Swiss-Prot record:
GO terms for molecular function: 6-phosphofructokinase activity; AMP binding; ATP binding; diphosphate-fructose-6-phosphate 1-phosphotransferase activity; fructose-6-phosphate binding; identical protein binding; metal ion binding; monosaccharide binding. Gene3D superfamilies: 3.40.50.450, Phosphofructokinase domain (3.40.50.460). Catalyzes the phosphorylation of D-fructose 6-phosphate to fructose 1,6-bisphosphate by ATP, the first committing step of glycolysis. GO terms for biological process: canonical glycolysis; fructose 1,6-bisphosphate metabolic process; fructose 6-phosphate metabolic process. Homodimer or homotetramer. Its EC number is 2.7.1.11. It comes from Corynebacterium glutamicum (strain ATCC 13032 / DSM 20300 / JCM 1318 / BCRC 11384 / CCUG 27702 / LMG 3730 / NBRC 12168 / NCIMB 10025 / NRRL B-2784 / 534). InterPro entries: ATP_PFK, ATP_PFK_prok-type, Phosphofructokinase_CS, Phosphofructokinase_dom, Phosphofructokinase_III, PKF_sf. One of its GO terms (cellular component) is 6-phosphofructokinase complex. This is ATP-dependent 6-phosphofructokinase.
């Protein structure tokens, strides 16, 4: 199909590489097919409120490759409000003459995209998350940048921990999966890594740290994913609360582990929570390339009429997978990967 009118939007948390996807969509649609691209602002809210801008293949689009965040803005929308607005969404897309929609987002966004597809809207999804937890794709863009940021923090904390004879805990993002923690811990030479997929025993962590000190190593680095949980009966956690989207908020698992280590071993323990710094800034070269390839493939899929699909990285190829494969389950860290990392502990 030629001369289409394609819409795109970014939803959920911001992520390095979003602008590269937008750029890939716009340049491919314009240069290869002579099509027009419209961007809805602030995610699903913008689609519901019909807040849109036309995206031109000009210098402004060319320059966004290096920028973090998203030029369209992003946000979250409660699923109930989203589903209640289906008639308005259809009307807005029809009034704007939209032939296809490319939502860019994580698991929640892709579930919303699937629901729109099930309701007759031509959709091609693009997976986005620094957590790397979308199933069916080898990597999501944003993950490499987040790992680079976390690894840099771990690298820097080695010297300060050693100078002060401290145990340093680095808490990274990862509510349900530990890909960032696993990779940053291994790349940064952490002495213990804690991930949600493997409930931890605080006694084992303490033994690993004490063993280091007994061997004459007067410091330790522990990388902890924010969603890590203790093995049942080994440590009592301070409770968080549930936010408006049904997500559990955390009271700082890194600090709770730090407090336990201090009480049990008496060592000076400090915690660094990286938080949203992992989402910001210029994307790495890997993420720019991957995000660009996602945008190009998504635009081509629209012109091929290949809807109700999600772009995905399989080996070296960008392929199309079903929404069911992408959102059916989270891509967790396999236990054997954690065992490999465990060999580097201590």
């Amino acid at each position: 199909m030629e001369d289409m009118r394609i819409a795109t939007l970014t939803s959920g948390g911001d992520c390095p590489g979003l602008n590269a996807v937008i750029r890939g969509i716009v340049r491919t649609a314009s240069n290869e097919f002579g099509s027009t691209v419209v961007g809805y602002q602030d995610g699903w809210e913008g689609l519901l409120g019909d807040r849109r801008v036309q995206l031109y293949d000009d210098e402004d689009i060319d320059r966004i490759l290096l920028r973090g965040g998203t030029i369209l803005g992003t946000g979250r929308l409660h699923p109930d409000k989203f589903k209640a607005g289906i008639d308005q969404i259809k009307a807005n897309l029809e009034d704007a003459g939209i032939d296809a929609l490319i939502p860019i987002g994580g698991e929640g966004t892709l579930k919303g995209a699937k629901w729109l597809s099930d309701n007759g809207i031509p959709v091609v999804g693009v997976p986005k998350t620094i957590d790397n937890d979308v199933n069916g794709t080898d990597f999501t863009f944003g993950f490499d940048t987040a790992v680079a940021v976390a690894t840099d923090a771990v690298d820097r904390l080695h010297t300060t921990a050693e100078s002060h004879n401290r145990v340093m805990i680095v808490e990274v993002m990862g509510r349900h999966v530990g890909w960032i923690a696993l990779h940053a811990g291994m790349a940064g030479g952490a002495h213990y890594t804690v991930i949600p997929e493997v409930p931890f025993d605080i006694a084992e962590i303490c033994k690993a740290m004490e063993r280091r000190f007994q061997m004459g190593e007067k410091y330790g680095i522990i990388v902890v994913a924010e969603g890590a949980l203790p093995r049942e009966g080994t440590m009592e956690l301070r409770e968080g609360h549930i936010d408006q989207f049904g997500h559990k908020t955390f009271t700082g698992i890194g600090q709770q582990i730090a407090d336990e280590i201090h009480v049990r071993l008496g060592h000076d323990v400090r915690t660094t929570v990286l938080g949203h710094i992992q989402r910001g800034g210029t994307p790495t070269a890997f993420d720019r390339v991957l995000a660009t390839r996602y945008g190009v493939r998504a635009a081509r899929a629209c012109h091929e009429g290949s809807f109700d699909k999600v772009v995905a990285l399989k080996g070296e190829s960008i392929e199309m997978i079903t929404f069911e494969e992408a959102v059916g389950t989270l891509k967790e860290v396999p236990f054997e990967r954690w065992v490999t990392a465990q060999a580097m502990f201590g």
